[in-house]
């Protein structure tokens, strides 16, 4: 079989960590000679992995069957799953069934948090499914090259043979993993004597690439896992204790990303507040990053109690994007205490005040859970009032989902789904109003951003403050810009009018 005539379909559900890891797997697949595509965006890329051009938009559309390539040409479907809510797992099962239906001869390789906790249940969905634990997904770095060899050595594709071979290969790899790895020394006087770190830390950061097929803006995972014990959260069970990428490796990976021509990078992690390395905590690492790169830095998520006197001055730096997403969850002290969150409502107000003090009208978003066990109407009204008073430009509101293995699984009294749904509806209506108000406040103003790759003849720009706007060009300007280009635009209603292509965004 000819590897170049075979394709691998990649699907990602959940957080930016999953997106980062899926991008890295995609880059390895292109290195091995496969074509890569996703049902979210259609055909993605056949360009070599060392080509920095981005060829697919960032925003994922709702799940749909793809007709991008004939199903018989797809030898593997890679699915990175999420377990944050019951609906996330339901969505994963639905996607897996769609893949089985669309690609009846392909191996369905499922990994991620859901696969870490429910591998047997996932494999029971169909004989062609191989569920691989999320905490061992580093071993997947070996799969593309191995699969390419299998394809090249085979006259035709036999699903049972390929599934058995991949399963055996992964099993064999688990017995041959070295016990420790040595990090590379960094060429910086403030980072020396890098220590050897354990195999789990090495594993969790193995999937990494400076090249991105599905995103116009780079992603860098610097932390994984969580040491907290929030009553509702199952992610800590799936990803384990907090681990961090050593500072030397952070800087090395940033250097590789910057060399591709990237103008912006998002730092990702399960809980960036728990980043620890030989240079100190997250604030110390951020300071070092700002000293060693000229790229714009976007921070994926922060806890309100981490917006303190050591971090705030760094967030004022001009390279830090004026966009902050806070893991808030509730505006009721009673509910926050029951959730085992390490802060109270006053801390949230203080954090938002500090962010607005150091940045000019930043985009501030928040995660909110409605319907947590015991949440009264008064508790919810406190949360709603906080969201209104703090004028969050984005609110990610979702109903409480009881997760097996968590303390909240058995907490009483349960809030009826109907009531939780009403609260979500009210929060979503507020979010829509405040989002529109935030956009209106920027009408007529200039701002910089990164262009997304064309989709259906239209391009969008993601501004520094996280506005996603259709890009308007006049007839004298280029018909299409490359995804990833850095531009200056003027906000005009719900659109962005191109005013300048910035060749050097650091000037």
Where are these regions (language model features)?
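Proteins enriched for Cys/Gly/acidic motifs involved in redox and nucleic-acid/cofactor modification
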Residues: 1-268, 273, 310-313, 324, ...
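Short flexible coil/turn linkers enriched for glycine and charged/polar residues
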Residues: 214-215, 226-227, 330, 362, ...
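Conserved SAM/AdoMet-binding glycine-rich loop
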Residues: 108-109, 117, 258-380
